[in-house]
From Swiss-Prot:
GO BP term, example: carbohydrate metabolic process
Positions of the catalytic residues: E139, E144
Family: Belongs to the glycosyl hydrolase 16 family.
InterPro entries: Actin-crosslinking (IPR008999), ConA-like_dom_sf (IPR013320), GH16 (IPR000757), Secre_tail (IPR026444)
Major enzyme class: hydrolase
Presence of keyword Hydrolase: yes
GO molecular function: hydrolase activity, hydrolyzing O-glycosyl compounds
Keyword match Transmembrane helix: no
Main location per the UniProt record: periplasm
Signal sequence interval, chain numbering: 1-17
Protein known as: Beta-porphyranase A
Occurrences of domain GH16 (ranges): 18-275
Organism: Zobellia galactanivorans (strain DSM 12802 / CCUG 47099 / CIP 106680 / NCIMB 13871 / Dsij)
Keywords on record: Glycosidase, Hydrolase, Periplasm, Signal
């Protein structure tokens, strides 16, 4: 998980990932971990990816260079670089002078899966692509995007174009490609957008933009073979393979790391399995604050520790820390937001022995629960990721809550009831108090809508992005002991603040 840097003035967690398509009856979406990656480490996960294309050298005048695909600052970076000056080769349209980038999955993609990736294109006259190939007869291009064509007459269309395509080879050689396109609201080089692809069947391909279906292709032949998932960059010296005549990349742009890099925030892949995704949660009190209490033993109320360390049944009465807000999870089921610190209740990955804690900054897989009403004011809560029920042992006083329950009986049941919402004055007071997180001290000035940040000395700048990935604020240079950020110009909505080293947090302005 990306490290949380600080709490901001308008502290509300937000989920910015795209909504999954509605599953077919009797099915639910399950994440395919081997094909999914948040790119949060310090290096590319070699269990999942090749950092080059082992099955193809690339498209002349570019070749893929091992290592030009790398992970840093929370992104998979695909950087295209200058191997030699184009003037030094005999034919700049055919001779190799550009080092391109590719990341190829080691696990094969399959029909039936849903694939989505959030990325920003490079500002080059090259493709920034998300596609599938390395089979016997087929290719599926989810997007081949031209961020900054050298042909000036294409600047008004190609940077806004979401182009999909299918190609046919081998036993189907001779069939013409079949594609379509969608005009995006902004340029791919300026914005992080989420591009989705549901390989619904061999005969139906659905394409999504920021969670909304925008295109559909019925391929010329059934596309039923497993393929590799690929992110890459390529030079297209001529109009070919469904890509327009865009012009060669400019050497000065290939030297500029602010322009030569396609940045992938994450890729997430899901498959349909039998079952329903927390659909029993339809009777959950969405939007209400509730308390949870052990049904036997010491009968204590569940408390969300403010430091986010754990949930523990230790409250004798319902106070601020014993209240949780029930919210709808975007993938089904619910989330619980702790009133103690504004964080989402989460498990710690698949480790069922670790405490449940109020530490989630967004509504992800760790924060997804099923609400199962047991009647008579009782409820059982199942974490969807682990498949286990939250448990408070009756035999322990001040019991720590863990996702260990194999069934929804006894220790796994809680008495619940609706509680009064925190008053506006209480909520305002909580927003305005001074925050100290990991040595970083943050305090707002509501009258002037500025935020003072201490403890970021030495960081190389910071930036604020809106929910579509557009940069809306920035502070450049090496940060000092005390920095101020004016947020008065921001409209209502969700935002991401990220420092130069990649530390970040989500916030919302109301």
């Amino acid at each position: 998980m990306k490290k949380v840097l600080l709490f901001l003035i308008f502290l509300v967690s937000a989920n910015l990932s795209a909504q999954l398509p509605s599953p077919t009856n009797g099915k639910k979406w399950e994440k395919v971990e081997q094909l999914s990656d948040e790119f949060n480490g310090n290096s590319i996960d070699t269990n999942k990816w090749y950092d080059y294309h082992p099955f193809w050298e690339g498209r002349a005048p570019s070749n893929f260079k091992k290592g030009n695909a790398f992970v840093s600052d929370g992104f998979l970076n695909l950087r295209s670089t200058l191997r030699k000056e184009p003037s030094s080769v005999q034919d700049p349209f055919k001779d190799i002078w550009v080092d391109a980038a590719a990341a190829v999955s080691k696990t094969k993609a399959q029909p039936g899966y849903y694939y989505e990736a959030r990325f920003k294109a490079s500002s080059l006259s090259m493709t920034s692509s998300f596609w599938f190939r390395v089979g016997q007869f087929s290719e599926i291009d989810v997007i081949e995007h031209i961020g900054n064509p050298s042909k000036e007459n294409r600047q008004d269309d190609l940077p806004y174009q979401y182009h999909v395509n299918t190609h046919y080879y081998g036993k189907h050689a001779g069939l013409q490609p079949l594609g379509t396109e969608y005009k995006m609201p902004g340029r791919g080089r300026d914005n992080f957008y989420t591009y989705g692809f549901w390989w619904k069947s061999p005969n139906e391909l659905l394409f999504y933009f920021n969670g909304k279906q925008v295109m559909r292709i019925v391929p010329r032949v059934p596309l039923d073979e497993e393929l590799r998932m690929i992110f890459d960059t390529e030079v297209f010296p001529f109009a070919t393979a469904g890509v327009a005549n865009i012009g060669l990349p400019k050497p000065e742009n290939l030297r500029d790391n602010s322009k030569n890099t396609m940045k992938v925030d994450w890729v997430r892949v899901y498959k349909l399995v039998d079952g329903t995704a927390a659909e029993d949660s339809s009777d959950a009190p969405i939007g209400s604050y509730i308390s949870l209490k052990k049904t036997q033993g010491d009968g204590k109320f569940v408390t969300g520790e403010k430091d986010g360390s754990q949930l523990v049944a230790r409250g004798s009465t319902v106070q601020s820390w014993e209240k949780f807000k029930v919210e709808k999870h975007p993938k089904g089921g619910i989330t619980l937001k702790a009133n103690s610190n504004g964080k989402y209740v989460q498990v710690q990955g698949s480790d069922i022995n670790k405490p449940v804690r109020a530490a989630g900054d967004f509504q992800g897989d760790w924060e997804q629960f099923e609400w199962k009403s047991k009647g008579n004011g009782l409820v059982a809560l199942k974490n969807v990721l682990t498949g286990k029920w939250l448990q408070a042992p009756w035999t322990e006083n001040n019991a720590i809550i863990r996702p260990k329950g194999p069934v929804d009986n006894g220790w796994e049941t809680f008495a619940w009831k609706k509680e009064t919402s925190p008053t506006a004055s209480t909520a305002l007071s909580a927003q305005l108090e001074t925050k100290t997180v990991d040595g970083i001290r943050v305090y707002p000035s509501p009258a002037s809508e500025t935020l003072t940040i201490e403890g970021v000395e030495g960081e190389n700048g910071l930036r604020v992005f809106d929910s579509t990935g557009n940069p809306v604020l920035k502070k450049e240079g090496i940060l000092g002991r005390k920095e101020r950020l004016n947020v008065s110009g921001l409209i209502k909505g969700n935002y991401l603040l990220r420092t130069g080293s990649g530390e970040q947090t989500w916030f919302q302005k109301n």
